A protein has these predicted regions:
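C-terminal accessory/regulatory regions appended to core domains
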Residues: 1-214
Length: 214
């Protein structure tokens, strides 16, 4: 890549290796490449966060307040790309969905997925009827327990679903770690994990609403 500022070889980094100017982002770079990471599910989130914070400091708007238009635009575009990559890779389910979409495209098999959320990483896949029935019954049980004021039952339901979610994500991690990942099986596990995650989020929101009726 040729640097827009010094017109010399800028290298592959965020900053020109010669003059230090921020370079426009590579539109073809995936979220892993943004952080210079290998494309895999198992990441050290602490290291990822440290890298993210270091990069955001370099791209902080105050550093470009008096820069020319090209420098400000490059830093803004880099920031957008960086934040999107961070939001996706820092969350296990989102990271798994994104990695699955990359692996599926590379294998030439979309696994029935159509990217739909802001990170382009949430897939639409057939949902097992038994899973839908299970989650519906869990929601009904949670609602009834709340109406009765059965705190122990609510806690047990939430703990059970959390355990199910964690089990599915453990299977997802194992699936990606396999020598030849079964993408369809990983996708099915992720569907279940998302449904369990949604239940937990709804349960938490409902609990907060009861604590603060205003």
């Amino acid at each position: 890549m040729i640097c827009w500022s010094c017109e010399k070889n800028a290298g592959d980094g965020m900053l020109c290796s010669g003059c230090g100017a921020v370079q426009p982002p590579d539109r073809l770079a995936d979220h892993f490449r943004v952080f210079g990471l290998p494309r895999r599910f198992d990441l050290d989130i602490a290291d990822l966060e440290r890298c993210y914070k270091e990069m955001t400091k370099v791209l902080h708007p105050d550093r470009f307040a008096r820069a020319d238009g090209r420098a400000r635009r490059a830093s803004l575009e880099r920031s957008v790309q960086l934040n999107l990559a961070w939001r996706t890779l820092s969350q296990p389910v989102a990271r798994a969905e994104y990695l699955l979409s990359l692996e599926s495209m590379e294998a030439g098999a979309p696994v029935g997925s159509t990217p739909s959320d802001e990170a382009g990483n949430r897939a639409t896949r057939p949902v097992d009827t038994a899973l839908l029935v299970e989650v519906m019954e869990l929601r009904e049980a949670l609602s009834e327990a709340r109406v009765r004021g059965d705190v122990a039952k609510v806690a047990a339901l939430v703990a059970g679903v959390q355990a199910n979610h964690d089990k599915e994500m453990a299977e997802v991690a194992a699936g990606f770690a396999a020598q030849r990942p079964n993408l369809a099986a990983i996708g099915a596990r992720l569907v279940a994990a998302r449904y369990y995650r949604r239940f937990l989020e709804e349960a938490e929101a409902s609990s907060q609403g009861e604590e603060d009726p205003t």
